[in-house]
Amino acid sequence: MLIITQTALELGFLYALVAMALFLSYRILDIADLTTDGCFVLGAAVSVTATAAGHPVLAIFAAMLAGTCAGFVTAFLQTKLGVPSILAGIVTNTGLYTVNLMAMGWKSNQSLLGGKTVFTMLRETGIGGEWYELLLAAFVTLLAGLLLVLFLGTRMGLSIRATGDNPDMVRATSLNPSFTITVGLCLANMLTALSGAIVGQYQKTVDINSGTGIVVIGLACLIIGETLLGRRSVKKGVIAAILGSIVYRFIYAIVFYTKIVPVECLKLLTAIIVALAIAAPSIQKWATFQKRKMAARNKEGV
């Protein structure tokens, strides 16, 4: 049971970076960025390939740079070519499939058999004992979360937040919304690629299809966290992303351990939860309308 708890915490922290990326793109910028799936694999592919070449630390930064480039392409399609945000994400995601294959040497998967990773480097120092993987995962995620909160409190960060709320107001202050959108999407995809990079070294493998459904899982984590903490501020939003990811991984671990629901059906269950959570305001309005309608009929009947 201790191993299950440890693994759930490790994966919860690692995938929380994706939830934070979606918090930035979906909640702050109000953009449905579908680049996430391909960008996650891009980060993992670059990281594993560079690590196999003997550069595990450099691999992390290379993956982040690759993710930033993917975000820039998506933003360029939206802001300069007028492609709708959803289509821009789909187009970039489709192109990333070939880029990811190229990064893996035109193979559908790649592994690190006995190779040195950032995790093994930490283990060799003796820091963290048996919990060294959890220690590194928590450190990277919490540091990224802190930096994101601090960044969104700067002038540029406030401009990005304002762009999601009211682009016209941003234009009135002589700022270019296209620039703030580009910065926001680059940062979001950098976080996604960072998650893929760390996960790739954690699992010591990457597969071309390993990013399938990541955007839905990330949204589920974000929604779970917001349900528990709310979304009144940026700080709470980032904490909610981390907490939601950990809770989701514990749910996954419980389902896997108890077999209450077949593990093969978990992504379907996740998709249903996300759909219901996103549709909740509309469902609530419909329910309120029906109650008023019934109350009006009852009054007429009396």
Where do the model's predicted regions map?
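Single transmembrane alpha-helix segments in multi-pass membrane proteins
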Residues: I3-H55, F76-L81, I223-G230, I272
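Transmembrane helix-bundle core of multi-pass membrane transporters
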Residues: S85, L96-G153, V183, C265, ...
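Cytosolic-side transmembrane-helix boundaries in multi-pass membrane proteins
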Residues: D165-A172, N176-F179, I251-V302
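Transmembrane alpha-helical segments in multi-pass inner-membrane proteins
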Residues: T192, G196-K267
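Helix-loop-helix "hairpin" substructures at the membrane interface of multi-pass membrane proteins
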Residues: A70, E130-V215
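Alpha-helical transmembrane segments within multi-pass membrane transporters and channels
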Residues: L22, H55-T94, V99, T141-L143, ...
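Loop-to-transmembrane alpha-helix initiation sites
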Residues: L11, I86, E133-A137, I181, ...
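Short loop segments and helix-boundary regions at transmembrane helix junctions
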Residues: R27-A32, F72-T117, L122-R123, R155, ...
